[in-house]
Protein backbone atom coordinates (compact mmCIF):
# COMPACT_ATOMS: atom_id res chain seq x y z
CA UNK A 1 0.00 0.00 0.00
CA UNK A 2 1.42 3.45 -0.84
CA UNK A 3 2.61 5.64 1.95
CA UNK A 4 -0.13 8.03 3.02
CA UNK A 5 1.44 9.52 6.14
CA UNK A 6 1.42 13.31 6.21
CA UNK A 7 3.39 14.67 4.47
CA UNK A 8 3.13 11.65 2.18
CA UNK A 9 6.10 12.69 0.04
CA UNK A 10 9.30 11.41 1.76
CA UNK A 11 11.35 14.45 0.75
CA UNK A 12 8.80 16.84 2.22
CA UNK A 13 8.56 14.75 5.39
CA UNK A 14 12.35 14.69 5.76
CA UNK A 15 12.64 18.48 5.50
CA UNK A 16 9.84 19.03 8.00
CA UNK A 17 11.40 16.49 10.39
CA UNK A 18 14.82 18.16 10.43
CA UNK A 19 13.23 21.60 10.79
CA UNK A 20 11.10 20.44 13.73
CA UNK A 21 14.06 18.73 15.42
CA UNK A 22 16.00 21.99 15.12
CA UNK A 23 13.11 23.91 16.68
CA UNK A 24 12.96 21.37 19.52
CA UNK A 25 16.68 21.86 20.16
CA UNK A 26 16.23 25.62 20.28
CA UNK A 27 13.35 25.40 22.76
CA UNK A 28 15.05 22.82 24.98
CA UNK A 29 18.26 24.84 25.24
CA UNK A 30 16.37 28.05 26.04
CA UNK A 31 14.36 26.31 28.75
CA UNK A 32 17.36 24.51 30.23
CA UNK A 33 19.29 27.75 30.60
CA UNK A 34 16.33 29.91 31.61
CA UNK A 35 14.68 27.60 34.15
CA UNK A 36 17.55 26.31 36.31
CA UNK A 37 18.53 23.28 34.23
CA UNK A 38 15.00 22.01 33.72
CA UNK A 39 14.71 20.17 30.42
CA UNK A 40 11.78 21.02 28.17
CA UNK A 41 11.96 17.86 26.04
CA UNK A 42 14.75 15.63 27.37
CA UNK A 43 12.73 13.53 29.77
CA UNK A 44 15.57 11.06 30.40
CA UNK A 45 17.48 13.93 31.98
CA UNK A 46 14.47 15.03 34.02
CA UNK A 47 13.92 11.44 35.17
CA UNK A 48 17.52 11.24 36.40
CA UNK A 49 17.12 14.59 38.16
CA UNK A 50 13.89 13.39 39.78
CA UNK A 51 15.59 10.20 41.00
CA UNK A 52 18.49 12.19 42.42
CA UNK A 53 16.05 14.52 44.19
CA UNK A 54 14.18 11.56 45.68
CA UNK A 55 17.44 10.04 46.94
CA UNK A 56 18.12 13.18 48.98
CA UNK A 57 14.48 13.62 50.11
CA UNK A 58 14.15 16.78 48.03
CA UNK A 59 10.40 16.52 47.52
CA UNK A 60 10.19 19.94 45.89
CA UNK A 61 12.59 18.69 43.23
CA UNK A 62 10.63 15.45 42.85
CA UNK A 63 7.45 17.43 42.25
CA UNK A 64 9.23 19.86 39.91
CA UNK A 65 10.66 17.19 37.62
CA UNK A 66 7.81 14.72 38.02
CA UNK A 67 5.12 17.15 36.94
CA UNK A 68 7.13 18.17 33.89
CA UNK A 69 7.49 14.51 32.87
CA UNK A 70 3.73 14.01 33.31
CA UNK A 71 2.93 17.08 31.19
CA UNK A 72 5.27 15.91 28.42
CA UNK A 73 3.62 12.48 28.44
CA UNK A 74 0.20 14.12 28.23
CA UNK A 75 1.45 16.15 25.26
CA UNK A 76 2.36 12.97 23.37
CA UNK A 77 -1.05 11.53 24.30
CA UNK A 78 -2.95 14.64 23.20
CA UNK A 79 -0.89 15.05 20.04
CA UNK A 80 -1.64 11.50 18.94
CA UNK A 81 -5.38 12.10 19.41
CA UNK A 82 -5.28 15.44 17.59
CA UNK A 83 -3.37 13.82 14.73
CA UNK A 84 -5.90 10.98 14.47
CA UNK A 85 -8.90 13.33 14.60
CA UNK A 86 -7.53 16.02 12.26
CA UNK A 87 -7.15 13.94 9.11
CA UNK A 88 -5.31 15.84 6.40
CA UNK A 89 -5.21 18.93 8.65
CA UNK A 90 -3.00 17.21 11.25
CA UNK A 91 0.20 19.08 10.43
CA UNK A 92 -1.15 22.66 10.43
CA UNK A 93 -3.33 21.88 13.47
CA UNK A 94 -0.45 20.48 15.53
CA UNK A 95 2.06 23.14 14.47
CA UNK A 96 -0.34 25.99 15.22
CA UNK A 97 -1.12 24.49 18.63
CA UNK A 98 2.59 24.19 19.43
CA UNK A 99 3.30 27.80 18.44
CA UNK A 100 0.41 29.02 20.60
CA UNK A 101 1.63 27.02 23.59
CA UNK A 102 5.18 28.37 23.33
CA UNK A 103 3.89 31.94 23.32
CA UNK A 104 1.57 31.15 26.24
CA UNK A 105 4.57 30.01 28.28
CA UNK A 106 6.17 33.42 27.83
CA UNK A 107 3.06 35.35 28.87
CA UNK A 108 1.78 33.57 31.97
CA UNK A 109 3.21 34.40 35.43
CA UNK A 110 5.81 32.12 36.96
CA UNK A 111 4.68 29.38 39.30
CA UNK A 112 6.43 28.13 42.45
CA UNK A 113 9.52 25.95 42.23
CA UNK A 114 7.63 22.74 42.99
CA UNK A 115 4.89 23.44 40.43
CA UNK A 116 6.44 25.54 37.64
CA UNK A 117 3.26 26.00 35.66
CA UNK A 118 4.86 28.62 33.43
CA UNK A 119 6.94 25.89 31.75
CA UNK A 120 4.04 23.47 31.30
CA UNK A 121 2.77 25.01 28.02
CA UNK A 122 6.29 24.79 26.56
CA UNK A 123 6.75 21.18 27.69
CA UNK A 124 3.27 20.33 26.41
CA UNK A 125 4.14 21.80 23.00
CA UNK A 126 7.26 19.65 22.72
CA UNK A 127 5.31 16.57 23.76
CA UNK A 128 2.80 17.33 21.02
CA UNK A 129 5.61 17.66 18.51
CA UNK A 130 6.41 13.95 18.67
CA UNK A 131 3.03 13.12 17.10
CA UNK A 132 3.46 15.58 14.23
CA UNK A 133 5.09 13.38 11.58
CA UNK A 134 4.93 9.71 10.63
CA UNK A 135 7.48 7.52 8.91
CA UNK A 136 6.62 5.27 5.99
CA UNK A 137 5.39 2.56 8.38
CA UNK A 138 2.85 4.84 10.04
CA UNK A 139 4.93 5.29 13.22
CA UNK A 140 5.34 8.73 14.77
CA UNK A 141 8.83 10.21 14.38
CA UNK A 142 10.49 11.20 17.65
CA UNK A 143 11.62 14.76 17.06
CA UNK A 144 12.54 16.15 20.48
CA UNK A 145 15.12 13.66 21.77
CA UNK A 146 18.02 11.85 20.14
CA UNK A 147 19.05 8.87 22.28
CA UNK A 148 16.77 6.60 20.29
CA UNK A 149 17.90 8.22 17.04
CA UNK A 150 21.55 7.52 17.83
CA UNK A 151 20.74 3.91 18.74
CA UNK A 152 18.71 3.41 15.55
CA UNK A 153 21.45 4.98 13.44
CA UNK A 154 24.09 2.69 14.96
CA UNK A 155 21.85 -0.36 14.58
CA UNK A 156 21.06 0.69 11.01
CA UNK A 157 24.76 0.82 10.14
CA UNK A 158 25.21 -2.67 11.58
CA UNK A 159 22.19 -4.00 9.69
CA UNK A 160 23.57 -2.49 6.50
CA UNK A 161 26.77 -4.50 6.99
CA UNK A 162 24.59 -7.55 7.61
CA UNK A 163 22.75 -6.86 4.33
CA UNK A 164 19.51 -6.13 6.21
CA UNK A 165 19.30 -2.35 5.80
CA UNK A 166 16.40 -0.44 7.29
CA UNK A 167 14.84 1.85 4.66
CA UNK A 168 14.90 4.98 6.81
CA UNK A 169 17.68 4.58 9.39
CA UNK A 170 19.75 7.25 7.64
CA UNK A 171 17.30 9.99 8.64
CA UNK A 172 18.44 9.63 12.26
CA UNK A 173 21.77 11.37 11.54
CA UNK A 174 20.25 14.61 10.21
CA UNK A 175 17.68 14.56 13.04
CA UNK A 176 20.51 14.46 15.59
CA UNK A 177 22.36 17.23 13.77
CA UNK A 178 19.20 19.34 13.67
CA UNK A 179 18.59 18.97 17.41
CA UNK A 180 22.25 19.66 18.23
CA UNK A 181 22.38 22.70 15.97
CA UNK A 182 19.13 23.95 17.43
CA UNK A 183 20.59 23.68 20.94
CA UNK A 184 23.48 25.92 19.90
CA UNK A 185 21.07 28.46 18.43
CA UNK A 186 18.86 28.28 21.52
CA UNK A 187 21.80 28.95 23.82
CA UNK A 188 22.77 32.04 21.84
CA UNK A 189 19.17 33.29 21.81
CA UNK A 190 18.70 32.77 25.55
CA UNK A 191 21.82 34.75 26.37
CA UNK A 192 20.62 37.57 24.14
CA UNK A 193 16.89 37.69 24.95
CA UNK A 194 16.23 35.56 28.03
CA UNK A 195 12.76 34.05 28.29
CA UNK A 196 11.52 36.11 25.32
CA UNK A 197 13.73 33.93 23.10
CA UNK A 198 10.89 31.39 22.99
CA UNK A 199 9.23 33.74 20.50
CA UNK A 200 11.79 32.60 17.90
CA UNK A 201 10.87 28.88 17.82
CA UNK A 202 7.20 29.90 18.10
CA UNK A 203 7.61 32.04 14.97
CA UNK A 204 9.29 29.16 13.14
CA UNK A 205 6.42 26.83 14.09
CA UNK A 206 3.86 29.39 12.94
CA UNK A 207 5.67 29.72 9.60
CA UNK A 208 5.67 25.94 9.12
CA UNK A 209 1.98 25.83 10.08
CA UNK A 210 1.13 28.38 7.37
CA UNK A 211 3.19 26.43 4.83
CA UNK A 212 1.45 23.18 5.77
CA UNK A 213 -1.96 24.87 5.62
CA UNK A 214 -1.28 26.26 2.14
CA UNK A 215 -0.09 22.86 0.94
CA UNK A 216 -3.18 21.21 2.36
CA UNK A 217 -5.52 23.74 0.73
CA UNK A 218 -3.69 23.77 -2.60
CA UNK A 219 -3.33 19.98 -2.88
CA UNK A 220 -6.30 18.57 -0.91
CA UNK A 221 -6.34 15.21 -2.72
CA UNK A 222 -2.68 14.94 -3.63
CA UNK A 223 -0.40 12.31 -2.08
CA UNK A 224 1.82 15.22 -1.04
CA UNK A 225 -0.78 15.89 1.64
CA UNK A 226 -2.73 12.73 2.54
CA UNK A 227 -6.23 11.30 2.33
CA UNK A 228 -8.85 9.72 4.56
CA UNK A 229 -6.96 6.46 4.13
CA UNK A 230 -3.88 7.72 5.95
CA UNK A 231 -2.79 5.54 8.86
CA UNK A 232 -3.07 6.82 12.38
CA UNK A 233 0.14 7.59 14.29
CA UNK A 234 1.85 4.41 15.52
CA UNK A 235 -0.31 2.25 13.26
CA UNK A 236 0.59 0.02 10.33
CA UNK A 237 -0.02 1.58 6.89
CA UNK A 238 -2.88 -0.86 6.25
CA UNK A 239 -4.71 0.22 9.42
CA UNK A 240 -8.19 1.60 8.82
CA UNK A 241 -8.73 5.31 9.56
CA UNK A 242 -11.05 6.38 12.33
CA UNK A 243 -11.89 9.72 10.78
CA UNK A 244 -13.18 10.63 7.34
CA UNK A 245 -12.18 13.92 5.74
Model-based region annotation:
Residues 1-13, 223-227:
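Short, Lys/Arg-rich, polar N-terminal cytosolic tail immediately upstream
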Residues 18-28, 37-40, 101, 113-144:
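Hydrophobic core of transmembrane alpha-helices in multi-pass small-molecule transporters
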Residues 40, 45, 51-52, 57, ...:
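Substrate-agnostic recognition of the 12-TM MFS/MFS-like secondary transporter fold
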Residues 69, 73-77, 176-184:
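Hydrophobic/small/kink-forming positions within alpha-helical transmembrane segments
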Residues 75-88, 190-191:
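Helix-to-loop junctions at the C-terminal end of transmembrane segments
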Residues 87-98, 116-121, 141-146, 173:
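Cytoplasmic-side transmembrane-helix entry/capping segments in multi-pass membrane proteins
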Residues 96-101, 196-214:
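Symmetry-related core transmembrane helices of the 12-TM Major Facilitator Superfamily/SLC fold
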Residues 99-114, 212-216:
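C-terminal ends and interior cores of transmembrane alpha-helices
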Amino acid sequence: MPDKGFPADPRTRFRFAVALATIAGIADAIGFMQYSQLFMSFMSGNTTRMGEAASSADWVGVARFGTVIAVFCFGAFAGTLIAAWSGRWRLPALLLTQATLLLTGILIPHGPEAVPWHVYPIVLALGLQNATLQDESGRSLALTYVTGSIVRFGAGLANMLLHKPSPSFWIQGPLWAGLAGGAVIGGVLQRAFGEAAFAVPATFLLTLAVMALLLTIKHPTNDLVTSAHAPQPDARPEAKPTVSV
